[in-house]
């Protein structure tokens, strides 16, 4: 099975790129780290009091994510889909069977960490580095529509999340991968994809 990790700050286009890749391949599946936030009372309380909670590792349910990741990797199938509800702070589970999986795409703000802990075999890593203002516009539109935030709150949360994303890797040495690509606004995506699948 081919593993692809896609990382980048909020609003950089990770989900869009993942869907574009899925459209070009057969038997692929996307695991979004956005659907693996912790739930329950403690998580609800922390989300109120910890600044940038959803951008920090303490919010990520790594155990549940790893369980699903390993199941797909070991069996080549997925039997359920998870979707995190940001307003209710719950994970909805849906039965959705996918068989003969040949490509597993992990995308989200925690994908970089996941690639270093779960990518113990050959994998490709794509990091999106997109203009900050462009990312902020996308996040505001999404948060107004899907997450019930005011424009001011969406702006403030984005600026904090941007800083958190880049600060958490500032002093960490992350092993370089031979199949690592940096995606900017000027990148020819089709060329990158052709290298991924050659």
Regions found by a protein language model. Name each.
Residues 14:
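Conserved lysine of the Walker
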Residues 98-101, 141, 163-198:
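NTP-dependent small-molecule kinase module
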Residues 6:
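Hydrophobic anchor at the beta1->P-loop junction of P-loop NTPases
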Residues 27-42:
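Short beta-strand-centered segment that lines the nucleotide-binding/catalytic pocket of NTP-utilizing
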Residues 29, 43-88:
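Conserved nucleotide-sensing/catalytic segment adjacent to the nucleotide-binding pocket
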Residues 92-148:
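ATP-dependent NMP and nucleoside kinases share a basic, alpha-helical "lid"
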Residues 10:
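The conserved Walker
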